[in-house]
Amino acid sequence: MSSDEKGISPAHKTSTPTHRSASSSTSSQRDSRQSIHILERTASSSTEPSVSRQLLEPEPVPLSKEADSWEIIEGLKIGQTNVQKPDKHEGFMLKKRKWPLKGWHKRFFVLDNGMLKYSKAPLDIQKGKVHGSIDVGLSVMSIKKKARRIDLDTEEHIYHLKVKSQDWFDAWVSKLRHHRLYRQNEIVRSPRDASFHIFPSTSTAESSPAANVSVMDGKMQPNSFPWQSPLPCSNSLPATCTTGQSKVAAWLQDSEEMDRCAEDLAHCQSNLVELSKLLQNLEILQRTQSAPNFTDMQANCVDISKKDKRVTRRWRTKSVSKDTKIQLQVPFSATMSPVRLHSSNPNLCADIEFQTPPSHLTDPLESSTDYTKLQEEFCLIAQKVHSLLKSAFNSIAIEKEKLKQMVSEQDHSKGHSTQMARLRQSLSQALNQNAELRSRLNRIHSESIICDQVVSVNIIPSPDEAGEQIHVSLPLSQQVANESRLSMSESVSEFFDAQEVLLSASSSENEASDDESYISDVSDNISEDNTSVADNISRQILNGELTGGAFRNGRRACLPAPCPDTSNINLWNILRNNIGKDLSKVSMPVELNEPLNTLQHLCEEMEYSELLDKASETDDPYERMVLVAAFAVSGYCSTYFRAGSKPFNPVLGETYECIREDKGFRFFSEQVSHHPPISACHCESKNFVFWQDIRWKNKFWGKSMEILPVGTLNVMLPKYGDYYVWNKVTTCIHNILSGRRWIEHYGEVTIRNTKSSVCICKLTFVKVNYWNSNMNEVQGVVIDQEGKAVYRLFGKWHEGLYCGVAPSAKCIWRPGSMPTNYELYYGFTRFAIELNELDPVLKDLLPPTDARFRPDQRFLEEGNLEAAASEKQRVEELQRSRRRYMEENNLEHIPKFFKKVIDANQREAWVSNDTYWELRKDPGFSKVDSPVLW
C-alpha cells in the first residue's frame, strides 16, 4: 500500500474489506441499480407512522451501468423494517474544499448511528472540535465508482468526498449505505426523531432539513407532508384561506402527541396481556390456598418507599414528552370500588388510583410467598397500565383542543373568502387602470421638452479628501423613470435598520466554489476593436441617429399574465437520472421557465449601468475601482426572488437587442455555440463599453443545483484608457425538490485594470455557514501596488454595497424597489418586466432571430401554457434537425455578429464584429439570410 493510501486509511479499523463475499457483491450490484422514488401515502399504509417520502422505495429501477457515471444509492424500501444496528466506522477521506483553500484536503471522518462527523484529526473529534456533521439518512447519496467519489447532498450543502484506495472506497460505500438505511429506519419507527433535525442547533449542525419539510421564518410551509394532497399555491387562494389551511397543515404535521399516544397504547396492550396471565395465576392460587381477599390486599398497599416512587417518576418522564406544555388534570375517585379486574371496565383509569406496591407485604396472615410475589407484580404492572392510559388520555385531550381551535379558525376564515375575492378583483382592476394611466403619463412625458438637469451624487471619501463630491450629469427623464430608486448618498443607517431574511443552514465549513478563477488580460487586438466605439456611440446618441423610433420611455409596468402553479410537477422523476450531470441538455417542462431567456439575463446585468457612467467621470483610480466593483455586485441582485424558475435556453443563432435612451446604452447578444452553450453580448455607451461571453454548466446533486459560469466580463472606460476584467462566482439553488427554493452566490471575484497596476479589487461572496448569519454577504477590499488596503467594502448583494467602516460608511449602490405583486410575476424587477416587450414600431426593426419573436416564450408570458409547451417542443425539434443536417454535411455554424479571438492567456473569447448596428440602420435585417429558428 502506498504512503498516500496509508494516509487515508482509518485510524481505528472496523473490518478490512480486502475480499468481498459473493453475497455482498451481489448486494452492491443490486444497490447500484436502485434509485429513490417518491411514494405517496395510501390508505393501506394508514397505520404506519408518517415518514418522509425520500425514505421509502418501490421496486428498484436500473440506472446507468457505466462505471464512470454517477449512481444514486437507494434508500429504505417498502416493508424493510429490520435493519441491524451498524458498527461505528471511522477513518480518513479526502474532502473537496472550496475557497479560499481549493482542492482536496484530508479529513478524519466518524460514522456513528447514521451521523457522519468530520474534523482535521482524530484528536479534534475527541476534543469535540467538529468541523461539520451530516445526517446521511436525510441526504441524497451518489457515487462514482471509477473516480472513487462519494457525494452527499443535504439540500443546503453538497459534500464532495473521495477515497484513494478502492478497498476503502468499497468499505465506506458499504458502511454509508448500512448507516443510511439504519438511520432512515429509525426515522420511520420514530417520526418525531426526524423533527429534532428540522431546526439546526446553534452550537452544532448535526442535521439538515428533511426532504419534504420546509421551514421558513419559523413556520411550516404547505404541502410538506406526504399524506396530504398538494395544496393550491398562494397565488390562486385568498390569503385568509391559505392561512387557515396552513394552520391545519401544521397541526397534521405536528403529530407528536398522537405518536406518543399510539406508543403508550401499544405498551399498555402488552402490559394488559401480562396482567391477564397474572390474574389467572392468582385465581388458581386463591382457589387452592386460603389466600386473602385481593381488594383487602390493595387497601394495605399504601406504604410507598421513596425508591419505588423515584422509579415510577422516572418511567413517567419517559412516557411524557418534555415538549408538552399543556397538562390536563383528570379527576380520580378518592375511594376504590371493588371491581373484577379480569373483566372489561372502560372507566378503570378514572375509578382507580393505583399506588406503588411495597417491596414486601407485612400481613402476618399471608404465608404463601408465590402468591405474594404475584400480587406485587400484578400491582406494579397495573400501575404502569394506569399511567399509560392516563398519558394517552391527556394526549388525546390535547389534540382534541388543537383540532377544535384549528377548525374554528378555518371556518372563520372561510366566512371572509367571498369578501376577499371581491376585494382582490377590485384591486386587480385598480392596478390595471393605474398601469394604463402611468403608461399614458410616460408617453406625454416623453413627448414634452425636458431640459437635462444636473444631480449631485456623493462619492466615496478618500482618506485625504474627505467630504469632496463629484458631479455627474443625469437626465431628468431618468430620475422620473427611476423615481423609486434610492439615492446613493442616503444614510448608511438605513442599511443596518433594513429587515434581513435569514435562512437556517446545515453544518459546513466556510467553503465556496471550487472552479478556478477565470481572469485573463484580453489581447491588444480586442482593445483596438473597441477603441473607437465610444466616440461613435456618443455622436449617434447626441444626434439622435440610433434608430428610427426605437427609443421609448412609455414602457410597460406589468406582465400580461401571472406565473403558473408548479406544485403538481414532480421534479424528482425528471432529475433523478441526471445527478452530477450537466442539466443544460435536459428538457424541462415549460411551467418551470420564466418568460425570459439567457440572452436577456445578460442584459439584466446592465440595469445599474449608471455606476459605470459615474466611474467614467471619476478621476481617482481607487474610486473608479470601487464603482466598477459595485457594478459587478449589482448584476446579482435581480436573482434574489428568481429561484423558483429558470430562463429559456437560447437556440443556436438566437439574438436579442435592447436600446435604452434613458440609460444611454445599446445592447445586443447572440447564442454563438450550442454544445457547449456559449452566450456572448456587447453593450455600448458614450461613457463605457461592456462585453462578455459566458459558458454555463448546470449540475444537479440530488437536492441542490450548482450553476458554474466560465468566462470573463470586460469593461472599458475610454476617457481614462482603463480596461477592467473580472470573473463570475458560483450560483447554487437549494431545496430543488421540496420546500421553498432559495438561491446563493459564493466565491471570489478579482477585478483588475489590465492597463494600469495602480490597484486591484478582491470581492468575496460569503457562503452560508452554521456558526453565524451571513446570508448573501459580500466583503471586499481595494488594494494598492504595495498591498495596502485603500478602501474596504461590505454589504449584501441583494440589499446594497457600502464603503468604509460602519457607522460612517457611505452607500455606493442600492437596488431599486420591487414592483407591486412581484411574487405573482416570476419575481421580476421593473427592468426585467420591460425586456421582452414588443410593440409594432420595434417589430419592424428587429432581426427575425430576436428572442422577442420566440413563440414558446411569448405564450408563457401571456399565460397560455398548453401552446407554450407545444411550441417549446417544436422549437427544440427544429434545433435538433438543424444540428443533424449540419453534422451530416460537415457544416459549422458561424455566428453573424460575433467573432472568435484568442486572448492573452491563449483562451477563446467572443467579441463583436461591428456589423449588428450597421445592418440595422437601413433597416437591413430583412435583406440578411437568417435561419428559421421557430
UniProtKB/Swiss-Prot annotation:
Record GO cellular component, one term: nuclear membrane
Family, similarity comment: Belongs to the OSBP family.
Protein name: Oxysterol-binding protein-related protein 6
Coiled coil: none
Recorded GO MF terms: cholesterol binding; sterol transfer activity
Function: Regulates cellular transport and efflux of cholesterol. Plays a role in phosphatidylinositol-4-phophate (PI4P) turnover at the neuronal membrane. Binds via its PH domain PI4P, phosphatidylinositol-4,5-diphosphate, phosphatidylinositol-3,4,5-triphosphate, and phosphatidic acid. Weakly binds 25-hydroxycholesterol.
Induction: By acetylated low-density lipoprotein.
CDD domains named among the record's database cross-references: PH_ORP3_ORP6_ORP7
Matches recorded under SUPFAM superfamilies: Oxysterol-binding protein-like, PH domain-like
Tissue expression pattern: Expressed in brain and striated muscle (at protein level). Widely expressed. Expressed in skeletal muscle.
Biased composition (Basic and acidic residues): 30-40
Record's subcellular location: Cytoplasm, Cytosol; Endoplasmic reticulum membrane; Nucleus envelope; Cell membrane
UniProt feature, compositional bias: Low complexity: 14-29
Bias type Polar residues, positions: 42-53
PTM annotation (Phosphoserine): residues: S35, S190, S290
Keywords: Acetylation, Cell membrane, Cytoplasm, Endoplasmic reticulum, Endosome, Lipid transport, Lipid-binding, Membrane, Nucleus, Phosphoprotein, Transport
The keyword Aminoacyl-tRNA synthetase is assigned to this record: no
N-acetylserine carried by residues: S2
Membrane topology per record: Peripheral membrane protein
Any one GO biological process: regulation of cholesterol transport
